[in-house]
Amino acid sequence: MATEATARKFFTSPFFAVSGPRRVDWLTVHAWYLFHDLNVTPVNPGSSHVTVQGKDYPTVPNLSALPNPQETSVSIITHPAVTLGVLEEAKKLGIPAIWMQPGTFDDSVLKLALADGAFSSVVYGEGGRGHDGWCVLVDGERAMNDAGKL
């Protein structure tokens, strides 16, 4: 189960990525990171860029294309079947922390995410201040503040 400590640890990374399909919720989370002046890379295999408030930001097709994966925390906004592949790649690359938005995980995803040594921080599930569980849009500022980034 995620805690304030796991959320805080997520935000200790110097780099961030948002992995998901090009949908409103993915764009909203990416914009949230930009609004908070965090170094964020959008990850989307189907789009070369994303536009936020009239400015284009280049995407990368997968986590392997991130410049510093071992220093990057990743927000995941995908269907559970897709999340499994994202987690497998993240684990292989040594990504330290993941934040799985509500609706992105099931039992098989949690088994992989919570496997011993897979990640140093996994934020997911019940808790946080939102009614659907831990959400970076709802709980991110508090965790950033606790990590000294606000």
Predicted regions and their residues:
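Short N-terminal or domain-adjacent regulatory/targeting segments
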Residues: 1-13
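Structural motif
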Residues: 15, 72-73, 97
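Conserved beta-strand elements of the Class I
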Residues: 15-17, 22
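NAD(P)-binding Rossmann-fold cofactor-contacting core
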Residues: 22-25, 29-52
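A short helix->loop->beta-strand "cap" motif at the edges of active sites that frequently abuts
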Residues: 36-38, 93-98, 116-120
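Glycine-rich, highly charged phosphate/nucleotide-binding loops
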Residues: 52-70, 75-85
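Rossmann-fold NAD(P) dinucleotide-binding segment
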Residues: 82-99
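Rossmann-fold NAD(P)-binding glycine/threonine-rich loop
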Residues: 102-140
